[in-house]
Amino acid sequence: MKCLFLLCLCLVPIVVFSSTFTSQNPINLPSDATPVLDVTGKELDPRLSYRIISIGRGALGGDVYLGKSPNSDAPCANGVFRFNSDVGPSGTPVRFIGSSSHFGPHIFEGELLNIQFDISTVKLCVSYTIWKVGDYDASLGTMLLETGGTIGQADSSWFKIVKSSQLGYNLLYCPFSSDDQFCLKVGVVHQNGKRRLALVKDNPLDVSFKQVQ
C-alpha cells in the first residue's frame, strides 16, 4: 500500500504540469456525463446538504460524521469517521462542490470535487470542514481522511464519486488529476475503537446519499 502512495507521489510532477488540467482549467465532462443520485433517485444538487450513509446492516452500516482525531492537537474536530452501526446517530451533513459548475446545479459521476461538512462553526474552525487526505500513518499502514483542505485547488482535497461494483457509490481520492489511474479508494480502518475513513487497496466503502431536510 505504501508503495502505491509513493507511486502516486512520483507521478505528481507529471500531472501538475499537464496542460489538460489545472485548478483554473478543469477537464470538461463529456456531454453524456451521468448525474449522481440520492436515495430517492433525485440528482445531487451542490446547493443542498446530504448525509453520507454506508450501505449495510449492523456493523457494516453507519453514517459518516466529523469527529475528534485521536491524539490530535488540532483546535477543532478534524477526523472523518463512520458510526459503528446503522442503528445510531445521524451523520454530519456535507456539501459536494464540483469542479464543473458551468454544467449547472449537478454533481456527476467521475467529476473532481471537494467535500465539505456543512455545519455552523466558529471562525477558528471554518478551515476544518473541508475534507482532505492526511499524511501516511505508519501504525495503520495507510493515509487517513481528515479536514483542513482547500476548495478548488490541485492538492490533497480532490475526490470523486463513482458507481460501485456492488451497491450505491464509492468515493475515490484523486490527487492532482482527473484520471482514474491516479485515484485511490476510500474505505474504513479501525482506529482506537472507531471506524475511520482512510485510503484502502480493497473493500472500498459503499455509500448512498440522503438529502438533509
Swiss-Prot record:
A Pfam match: Kunitz_legume
Chain positions of site Reactive bond for trypsin: R95, F96
Species whose genome carries this gene: Solanum tuberosum (Potato)
Site (Reactive bond for chymotrypsin): M143, L144
Protein name: Serine protease inhibitor 5
Family to which the UniProt record says this protein belongs: Belongs to the protease inhibitor I3 (leguminous Kunitz-type inhibitor) family.
Cited InterPro entries: Kunitz_inhibitor_STI-like_sf (IPR011065), Prot_inh_Kunz-lg (IPR002160)
SUPFAM superfamilies: STI-like (SSF50386)
UniProt GO MF annotations: serine-type endopeptidase inhibitor activity
Alphabetical keyword list: Disulfide bond, Protease inhibitor, Serine protease inhibitor, Signal, Vacuole
Signal peptide: 1-22
One Gene Ontology cellular component annotation held by this UniProt entry: vacuole
Function of the protein: Inhibitor of trypsin (serine protease). Protects the plant by inhibiting proteases of invading organisms.
